[in-house]
Every structure is written in structure tokens, then in C-alpha cells.
Amino acid sequence: MGFDYQRAVMLQRILSERVLAELDSFPRIDPSRIRSVAGVDASYRGGVQVGSAVLMDYRAKMPLAYTCLTSKPPIPYVPGLLAFREAPVYIKALHRLPAKPDIILVDGHGLSHPRAFGIATHIGLVLSTPSIGVAKKPLYGEVEEVNGRKLVRAHGRIVGEVVETNQGSEIYVSIGYLIRLEDAVEVVRHLMEPGLKLPLPIHLADNYSRSKCIKELRL
């Protein structure tokens, strides 16, 4: 049986209602208590999807472990449904890490999504783990300038922030799941390094998926 796109959209709408209802009860996260974070990303080679997850020491910003695996993309790329294409391989890669991260960073959006259920929210909800969406381009929502901050409003809520990187470019940080926006932005800022367009865990996951994973998997 083929992929049911209408059902996927309906599922996003149903689950996003639950997440938005929980938004104000998401806990604050004390940065001093964060031990490890994970970044996930994927690349494609000859029709094969290569997913990678990197576990990183949060304070030292040093990689602790990485995993990678291949999969056939379950569906083509469809705007708004990226989670159904890439989340399965990310979740499998995360399960293969030697320890569960305190926070997951995803190359993509969270609540700043047309149905408030981007890939970062999808993964965070499935794994019951705080998650953050980080993207180089906007997807959904209006930017409002408040006290010098560029906040992203969508679905009647502030769900993201435009953050300037060390390079002077902008990235779009959004709430995924189980994290407040202020904490998500603080985590992302801590993990940015000079010369990088995305936080270090995502950058390393991207590199692994494009180089070491391909060599190890002999693609």
C-alpha cells in the first residue's frame, strides 16, 4: 500500500494540537545540567539515504560517538512532510548511540511549520526527548522584532527566533518538543562555532553522513 499523504497531514494536525496545548508546560532547562546533546542529518547517494547521529559532550563540545545507517527514502521530498522522509532513519541512528542525549538538534524546523509539526517536533515527541529545530531558511511564520530580538510567530504563538551566527548570517531556531524557546536559543548559541552555518552537532552529523559513513558503508 502506498503512502497516504492526506493521512500524514491529518496526523500532523492532530498531534500538533497536543503539542501546542502542552507548550506552556514545557520545562525550563538548566544548561549546567546538560551533559550531552545529539545532532542528526542525512545525505543522499545514488538514491540511498544515509542518516547520521552524533553524540556530543555539551560543555566540552567534543564528539563522543556517532552512528550511521542507510535506508531507501520512504517517500519523495514533499514540503511540510520532511519528517516522514527522514525521521525514521534519524530515530534508528539515535537508538544506536551508546547513551540517550539530553537534547536533540535537528536540521529542520519544529513548531515553525505550516501545521506546527515539523521534523524536530516529530522526533522529539516520538522519543520523548527535548528537541530543537535549526534551519538556514524560514519555512512558516511571521518575524516580529521585540526588544532587539527577531521572534517567529506562528499559530498564534512565539515558536522560534532568528539568530545571527558568528559569520553574520542568520539561522532559524524553533521549539521542537519539551523545551522553551529561550533555552533552545541558548543551547544553539553555545554550540555555534566560527565558520559554521549550523550548530556543531548538526555540522558533524552532516560531515559524517557525507564522508565517513559513505566510506564505512562502501557506498
Curated annotation (Swiss-Prot):
EC number assigned by the record: 3.1.21.7
Underlying gene: nfi
Cofactors (names): Mg(2+)
Subcellular locations according to the entry: Cytoplasm
Catalytic reactions on record: Endonucleolytic cleavage at apurinic or apyrimidinic sites to products with a 5'-phosphate
List of residues binding Mg(2+): 41, 107
Keyword list, A-Z: Cytoplasm, DNA damage, DNA repair, Endonuclease, Hydrolase, Magnesium, Metal-binding, Nuclease
Family to which the UniProt record says this protein belongs: Belongs to the endonuclease V family.
CC annotations in GO: cytoplasm
Top enzyme category: hydrolase
Site (Interaction with target DNA): 77
Superkingdom of source: Archaea
Origin species: Desulfurococcus amylolyticus (strain DSM 18924 / JCM 16383 / VKM B-2413 / 1221n)
The keyword Hydrolase belongs to this UniProt entry's keyword annotation: yes
GO terms assigned for molecular function: deoxyribonuclease V activity; magnesium ion binding; RNA endonuclease activity, producing 5'-phosphomonoesters; single-stranded RNA binding
Entry function: DNA repair enzyme involved in the repair of deaminated bases. Selectively cleaves double-stranded DNA at the second phosphodiester bond 3' to a deoxyinosine leaving behind the intact lesion on the nicked DNA.
Protein name: Endonuclease V
Biological process according to GO: DNA repair
